[in-house]
Amino acid sequence: MPNFFRNGCIALVGSVAAMGAAHAEGGIAEAAGKALDSAQSDVTITAPKVMMVVATVVGVGILINMMRKA
C-alpha cells in the first residue's frame, strides 16, 4: 500500500508541473527550448577549459614518462 501512495504522489507532482509548464508563457516546448539553450551555453563555456585540463594532464604524463626513460 505505501508504494501506491508514493506512486500517486509522484504522479500528482508530475501532472501539476506539466500543467504549470503548459500554461506558462509559450508552453512546454518553449520551456524545453530555453532549457536546451541554457545547457548548450554551459557546454560552450566549459568545453575549452576541459580540453585545456585534459591537454595539461596528458602533457604532464608524457613529461614524467620521458623523465623516467632518461
Curated annotation (Swiss-Prot):
Name of the molecule in the record: Flexible pilin
Signal peptide annotation: 1-24
Major location (coarse): other
Keywords from the UniProt entry: Fimbrium, Signal
Keyword Signal among UniProt keywords: yes
Annotated Gene Ontology cellular component terms: pilus
Subcellular location: Fimbrium
Taxonomy of the source species: Bacteria, Pseudomonadati, Pseudomonadota, Gammaproteobacteria, Aeromonadales
Native species: Aeromonas hydrophila
Note: A.hydrophila possesses two distinctive pilus types: 'straight' pili appears as brittle, rod-like filaments, whereas 'flexible' pili are supple and curvilinear.
Record note on quaternary structure: Homomer.
Function: Fimbriae (also called pili) are polar filaments radiating from the surface of the bacterium to a length of 0.5-1.5 micrometers and numbering 100-300 per cell. They enable bacteria to colonize the epithelium of specific host organs. Flexible pili possess hemagglutinating function.
Protein origin, superkingdom: Bacteria
